[in-house]
Structures are given as C-alpha cells and as structure tokens.
C-alpha cells in the first residue's frame, strides 16, 4: 500500500487561528506545499487565497501534486451563487479539487430542496471543469440519522444527474476539522461515522478528514474503504509516526 497516495496534506488555518501575521502564515502554507511536493503526496489542501501560490510552486517543481481548496469554509451557510463564485475563482487559480462545505444547518432545519440544489449546481460546475468535487457534511454537527440521510441525499443527487463514470469524482467528506464540539467530543472522522458514510454514500467515494493522526488510524480508515484522508500531519503518518495535533 502506498499510503502517500491516499493523503491530502492539509493546512487550512487563517493567520489569526495560527496566531501569525498574514505573511508568516503564508510561509507556513508554503512549507506544507513544499513538503507535499517532496513527499509525493496525493494532494495539498489549502485555503483559496493560497491556491495560485501552490500552482506556481508545483509547476516550477514539475510535480504531479494536486491542489485542493475549500469552498464556503467552514460553516457552509453561503448561498449557492456565492459558493459557485468562490469555486470559479478557485478553478481559475488552478485548483484540482473543490471541497464544498454542505449547508448542513439548512439540512438539519428541513431545507432539503436548498441542499439538493446546491449539491447539483456546485457538483455540475466542478465536473464540467474536470475537477474532483467533495461535499463536507460535518459529522460532528449531525446525529447518526442525519449522517445517513445527508450522505444518501448527496449520493442520490449525483446518481440521478450524472453519468456513472463520474461517480468517483464526487466524494462525501466527513469534516472541516474546525467544528467546535462540547467537551472532549471528537470533531472529525470517527470509525462509526465513516462506516455510516461508506454504507450510505456508495458508490460515491468517501474522504475521512480530521482526527486521523497516526499511520495505524490511517490504515484502519483505508481498510474500511475510504479513498482519501485529510490530515495536517501527512508526513508523520507516512513515516509511521503518531501525532497529537488536532487536525
């Protein structure tokens, strides 16, 4: 198993979240990009404002590293038009993967048609531009029934509107890694949540993000059936190490 080809090395902190100046935070992001190039990871996952920087570094290095970015991050509450506008800019800047935060609060409040509409329109935009689309459902904000239902909703929109050969380009993704939970509850991928996603999103692939911090945990997720793992400690995982960093 080449675990590096499952890893989306991730740095999504804003400067304020990192306690850094904008310039210093960009330097940190650039270090993640350089590491991902050197380690031959599948993808580097970064904020939209860093995509063009990553594109230049990857092109200059003649690397096959893919670029992913997040759309409407981390709450997913923007309108469909706002999501699309942000995604178009990311595409123009050189993103390969578009990780949209689903409007999970609207889903929880019963606005099912709104969610179906954004999944359809944003997925269409991505696929028309030959991009990989991922839908972040934020499992820590959902109960088990909601995880099952939202995974199935995304699946049903995709299989009802797109050709079968495109299914592998639309993922259901567990988490932003930034959701605030009560106490010490996990805010990312857990084994139970991933199993529910796999069972109800299939044939769409699943990405586990947040909470996977060791080689052992990554292998366990892969054996369950996940196709991608988002983590800020990709090198430590690839080296078979453990880490205590939250995302």
Model-based region annotation:
Residues 11, 69-71, 92-107, 158-184, ...:
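Glycine-rich phosphate-binding active-site loops on the catalytic face of alpha/beta enzymes
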Residues 2-14, 44-46, 65-72, 98-100, ...:
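Hydrophobic faces of well-ordered beta-strands that scaffold small-molecule active sites
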Residues 74-89, 109-120:
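Glycine-rich anion/phosphate-binding loops
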Residues 33-53, 57, 98-116, 138, ...:
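Glycine-rich, proline-tolerant flexible connector loops at the mouths of alpha/beta enzymes
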Residues 1-80, 92, 153:
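Conserved N-terminal beta1-alpha1 strand-loop-helix module at the mouth
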Residues 78-92, 142-153, 196-204, 212-228:
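Catalytic cores of alpha/beta
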Residues 48, 52-73, 112-134, 141, ...:
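Alpha-helix-loop-beta-strand connector modules within alpha/beta enzyme cores
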Residues 1-31, 124, 196-204, 212-247:
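Alpha/beta catalytic cores of nucleotide-metabolism and tRNA/nucleoside-modifying enzymes
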């Amino acid at each position: 198993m080449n675990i590096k080809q499952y890893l989306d090395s991730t740095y999504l902190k804003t400067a304020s979240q990192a306690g850094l100046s904008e310039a210093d935070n960009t330097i940190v992001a650039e270090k993640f990009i350089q590491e991902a190039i050197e380690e031959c990871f599948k993808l580097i996952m970064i904020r939209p404002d860093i995509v063009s920087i990553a594109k230049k570094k990857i092109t200059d290095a003649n690397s096959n590293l893919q670029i992913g970015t997040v759309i409407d991050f981390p709450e997913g509450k923007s309108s469909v038009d706002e999501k699309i506008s942000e995604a178009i800019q990311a595409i123009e800047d050189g993103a390969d993967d578009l990780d949209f935060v689903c409007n999970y609060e609207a889903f929880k409040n019963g606005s099912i048609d709104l969610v179906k509409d954004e999944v359809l329109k944003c997925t269409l935009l991505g696929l028309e531009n030959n991009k990989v689309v991922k839908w972040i459902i934020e499992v820590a904000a959902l109960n088990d029934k909601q995880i099952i239902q939202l995974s199935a909703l995304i699946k049903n929109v995709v299989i009802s509107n797109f050709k079968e050969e495109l299914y592998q380009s639309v993922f259901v993704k567990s988490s932003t890694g930034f959701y605030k939970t009560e106490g010490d509850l996990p805010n990312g991928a857990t084994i139970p949540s991933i199993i529910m996603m796999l069972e109800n999103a299939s044939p769409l692939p699943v990405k586990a993000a947040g909470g996977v911090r060791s080689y052992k945990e990554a292998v366990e997720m892969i054996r369950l059936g996940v196709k991608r793992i988002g983590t800020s400690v990709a090198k430590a995982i690839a080296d078979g190490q453990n880490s205590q960093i939250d995302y």
